[in-house]
UniProtKB/Swiss-Prot annotation:
Residues 588-623, 829-899, 922-971, 985-1046, 1054-1083, 1106-1127 have a biased composition (Basic and acidic residues). One of its GO terms (cellular component) is eukaryotic translation initiation factor 3 complex. This is Eukaryotic translation initiation factor 3 subunit A. It comes from Drosophila yakuba. Component of the eukaryotic translation initiation factor 3 (eIF-3) complex. The eIF-3 complex interacts with pix. InterPro entries: EIF3A, eIF3a_PCI_TPR-like, PCI_dom. Belongs to the eIF-3 subunit A family. Keywords: Cytoplasm, Initiation factor, Phosphoprotein, Protein biosynthesis, RNA-binding. RNA-binding component of the eukaryotic translation initiation factor 3 (eIF-3) complex, which is involved in protein synthesis of a specialized repertoire of mRNAs and, together with other initiation factors, stimulates binding of mRNA and methionyl-tRNAi to the 40S ribosome. The eIF-3 complex specifically targets and initiates translation of a subset of mRNAs involved in cell proliferation. SMART domains: PINT. Pfam families: eIF3a_PCI_TPR-like, PCI.
Amino acid sequence: MARYTQRPENALKRANEFIEVGKPLRALDTLQEVFRNKRWNYAYSETVIEPLMFKYLYLCVELKKSHIAKEGLFQYRNMFQLVNVNSLENVIRGYLKMAEEHTEAAQAQSSAAVAVLELDDLDNIATPESILMSAVCGEDAQDRSDRTILLPWVKFLWESYCQCLELLRVNTHCEALYHDIARMAFHFCLKYNRKSEFRRLCDKLRKHLEDICKSSNQTTGVSINKVETQQLCLDTRLYLLDSAIQMELWQEAYRAIEDIHGLMALSKKTPVPKTMANYYQKLAMVFSKAGNQLFHAAALLKLFQLTRELKKNLTKDDLQRMAAHVLLATLSIPLPSAHPEFDRFIEADKSPLEKAQKLAVLLGLPQPPTRVSLIREVVRLNVPQLVSEDFRNLYNWLEVDFNPLNLCKRIQSIVDFIENGPENALLTPYIQSLKDVTIMRLIRQISQVYESIEFQRLMQLASFCNIFELEKLLVESVRHNDMQIRIDHQKNSIYFGTDLTESQREYRPDGPALQSMPSEQIRSQLVNMSTVLTRAVSIVYPNRERDQRAKLRTQMVNHYHEIKDREHQRILQRQKIIEDRKEYIEKQNNAREEEEARRQEEESRKAKLAEQKRLEQEQEERERKRHQNEIQAIREKSLKEKVQQISQTAHGKKMLSKLDEEGIKKLDAEQIAKRESEELQREAKELQSKLKSQEKKIDYFERAKRLEEIPLFEKYLAEKQVKDKEFWEATEKTRIENAIAERKDAVGQQERLKRMYPDRDEFLDALKKERASLYVEKLKKFEAALEAERKKRLADRIIRRREERRQAFLREKEEERLRKEEEIRLAQAAEERAAAEARRLEREAEDEKRRAQYEKQRAKEEEAERKIKEDRERLARELASERERTEKERDTWRPRGGDRPSAPSGGSGEWRRGAPTVNNERGIERGGDRIERGGDRIERGGERIERGGDRDRKDNEGADSSWRVRREPDSQRAAAPKDSGAPQSRDEKWRRGGERDRDFRNDGARRDRDDGPRRDRDDGPRRDRDDERSGFRRNDGPRRTEEPQRETGGNWRDAPRHADRENRRTAGGERRDRDVRETRGDQRGPAPKEAVSSGGGGNWRTTPAAREEKPATKRDQPQEKENKAADDGEWTSVKRR
C-alpha cells in the first residue's frame, strides 16, 4: 500500500495551522515528510517550494534542529543547483540571517538578565548564592548567563555555518556564496571569541581546498585551475589571515600564509601588487610575533622593494618612514651565532636548515637570508640615504664606525628619539633588540682594545644595561660567538683573548673592527710569514718570475702544436658521440614518454572504470540504505502513531508507563497492539470484579440508607408543605396590591392624555390641507408614468413572444429533420444486420453439410481400416507358420560353415534342394503381394490417389526393377542366363544382392524412401518423382510392354487392374488432395520399429494386410482422414540394414 503524500502547498497550509495552534513540532514533521518524498523533486518549481523551504528553515531555527535543516538544505540543493542558483542562495542566506538574529537576541537577553540580576537588590549586591557560585566555578554572573542563554544559540549558529559550507563546497555555481559564508564564519568567531571553532574552521577550509585540488569529474565540481576560483580562495585566505592575527592565533596565521603562498604559486596570473603588499605585511607581522627578527626584516625589505617599484604616487615622507622601518628592523637582528647549538650538539639534524629554507620559500628567496646579506641588500637599495639623519647615524655607528667608548651614548640618543616621537610608534618594538645588538657590538669592540677591563667601567660604557643583563650577554657571547672572555668576580674584572691556543673561526666577524685578537694573530702567523717571504723573493729576483712565465708559455705553445690535430679529431669524435648519445637519449625518451602515455591512459581508463564501479556501488548502497531508512521511518512513524493513539486512552497511558523508552523501541506496532489488548482484557476483568464487589456494597448501603431516610423524608415534606403555603399566600397578597396600584396609575395617565385630543385633531387637519395639492400632483405623475411603463412592457412582451414562437418553430423543424435521418440510419443498420445474419446462417449450413459428409467418410474409412487390420493378422499367422516350416528345413540345405548361398546363375530361383518351390514361392509371393498392397495403400494412400491414372506409364524394367528386388553384383549378373524365362521365387529375389543393395541404401533411399515429412518440398510434378523411383517402385500391375505374361498358376493379380486404378480417383479428387497437402502438409510419423524375421517369406513388411479390391467411390471431400491414418503410424515397418 503506497504511503499518503501531501502536495507542497497543502503541506504548507497544514504547517501554518499547526503553528497557529502552538504545535511547531507537528508542523516541522509535516514539512519534513514532504521533503523526504522523492516524487515532488522535479515536479514543482521554485515558486512553490521556496516558501515551503523558508517555513521549514524557520521552524528548524525556532526549535534548534540543525540536523533536520541540513537534510532539507541538501535536498533543496540537489533540486535547484542546476536550475535556479539564486533561489538556493536566497534560502541559505535567509537561514543564516535567522540564526544570526536569534543569536543576537539571545545575547541581548543574556545581558538583560545579568542587568536585572545586578539591579535586583542595591542594598545586598553580593548574595550568598553569587558568592558560592563564584567560589565554585570561578565565573561571574555574565558568564553563567551566557552559558545558559547564549551558548545554545552560538552552537546552533556554528553548526549552521558548517552545514552551509559543507553544502556548497563542490558547487561551482555557488562558489561566491561559499566564500561569503566562510567570511561570515570568521566574523562569528571574532565576535564571540571562539578560538577552538576558528581552528576547526581553518582545518575544514583547508580540507575543502585539498579536495578541490584533486581532479573531479562532477558536473558542478569546482576547478582550482580557473582564475576566478583562485582569486576567491586567495581573498578568503587573506581574510582568514587577518582574523587569525586579530585573535592572536599565530599558528593558524602561519598556516594561512602557507596556503596563500601555495595559491599564488598555483595561479598562472601574477597576483596584484596590493595583494602582495598585504601578504608581505601580514607575513612580517607573523614573523615579528614569532620572534624571528631575521625573516621579519626580510619580509619588510620585500615589502619596501614592492612598494617602491610599483606604487607610483608614493610620497617622500611615506618612503622615508618605510625605509626607517626596514633599516631599524635590519639593524635589530641579533648578531649571528658563530657556532650554533645545533652545529655543536646535533650536527646530523637538518630540521633547522629545512625550516629556514621553507621560510625563505614563503618570501620568494632562493636561500635563507642572513644578517650580512640583508645589510648588503639594504645598502644596495640605498636605504640609509633615504632615512632621516638620526637613523643614518645609527647605521654608521653600528655597522661602520669603531668607537666603543661612545657607542651606547649615541645609541641611547636614538632610542630616546624613537620613544619620544609619536610618529615612530611602529619602531618602538625594536628598541630592546637594538640595545642587545649595541651591547654585543660594544663587547666585541672592547675585546679588540683592552685585554682586561673592570666590571664597573664596562657598566659605565653600557649605560642602558644592568649588571645581570650584562653578565648574561657576556656568557652568551662566549657560548654563541666563540669570544674568549673570562670573568674574575674576585677582582671584579673581565679578561679578553688571553688564551693564545684558542681562536675564532677562519672568517672574520661582521661589523667594524680595529685589529685582530692575539689568538687570531697566532692562528694566522704562518699565513702571514708565507705572504712576507713571497713578497721578499719577488723583490730580490724581479726577472725570475718573468723568465719562468716565458718558458712556460713556450712549452705550452709547442705542446699545443703537437696535439692540436689529435685534439681536433678527438673533439670532433666527442661531438659525434655526443650527438649520437643525444639522439639515442631522445629516442629513449620518446619511447619512454609513449610508454608512459599508454600506461597513464590505461591507468586512467582503469581508474575511470573503478570510479564508475565505485559510484555504482555507492549508488546501490545509497539506494539500499535509503530504502532501509524509508522502511525504518515507516515503522517508526507507525509505531509513533500507534503509541500516540494508545497514549490518548487511560489504559494506554497505564500500559506505556510500565515500559521505558528502550522497551518501546524494541517493540513493533503488532506487539504494542497485542499488549494493549492484553491490558484491556486485564483491566476489563479487574473492572468486572470491582463492579461486582461495588454492586454488592452499594446494594446493602442503599437499602439501609433508604430505610433510615423514610421518616426523615416524611417530616421534611410536611414542613415544606406548610412553608410553601405561607410563601404562596404572601406572594399572592403582594401581587394583588401591585396590580391595584398599576391600574390607578394607568387611569390617571389616560385622563391626562384625553385633554390633548382637540389639539391633535386641529394639527392633523391643517397638515392634510397643506399637503393635499402636492399629493394630487404627485399622484397624477405617478399614474402617467405607470401607464407609459405598462405600454412599454406590453410592446416588449409582444416582440418577445413573437421571437419565442419563431424559435420554437425552427427548433421543431430541426428536430423533425434529425428524427428522419435517425430513422433512415436505423433502417440501414437493420438491413445490414439482417444481411450479415443471412450470410452467417448460410456459412453455418455449409459448415454443417461439410461436417456431415466428413463424418460419413470417416466412418467408411474406419470400416476399411478394420478390415485391413483383420486381413493383416490372418496373413501374419499364415506367414509365421510358413516361416516355422521353412526354418526346420533350412539347416539341411545350408552348406557347412557358410552363410546363405547366393542365387544360382541359372536363374531358377531354387536355392533349397528338394524343396517344392513353385507352390511355396507363389503362395509366399501372393501373401507378400497382399501385404504389400495392404500396407502400401496405407503407406502411400495420398500418393496412389494422387497418381490415379498415372500408374499406366511405361515400365520396361520388368521384374528386375521391382522395389523388393536387390540386384546381384555385376559378376554374378554376368554369369546368370539372360533369357531364363522361368519364374523365380520371391525369396530368391529378396536375397539377390550386390551393388544394387548399396545403391538402394545410398541413392534410392535418399531419393525415394520417405523417412519423415517431405511433402512440403517442391520436387516438381508427381509423375517425375514416380519416374525417379523406377529402381525399386512397386510394379505389380500390368505392364505396357509386349513381354508375355508369366504363368503364375491362376494368380488373382494377373488380372488387369487399369479399371480399378482409374476408378480410385475422380477428376476433382487429385486437385482436392493437392490442396489438402498444401494446407495441412502430408507429414508422416516415424515408422514403427518392428523386427523383420529372417525367414523365407522374403517380404520386408512384418504386418501383412489383405484388402478387397473394389472401385473407389467418388467423394466430394478430400480423403484427409485416410491419408492421416496412413501417415500416423502404419506407413512402413522396414528394418533398416
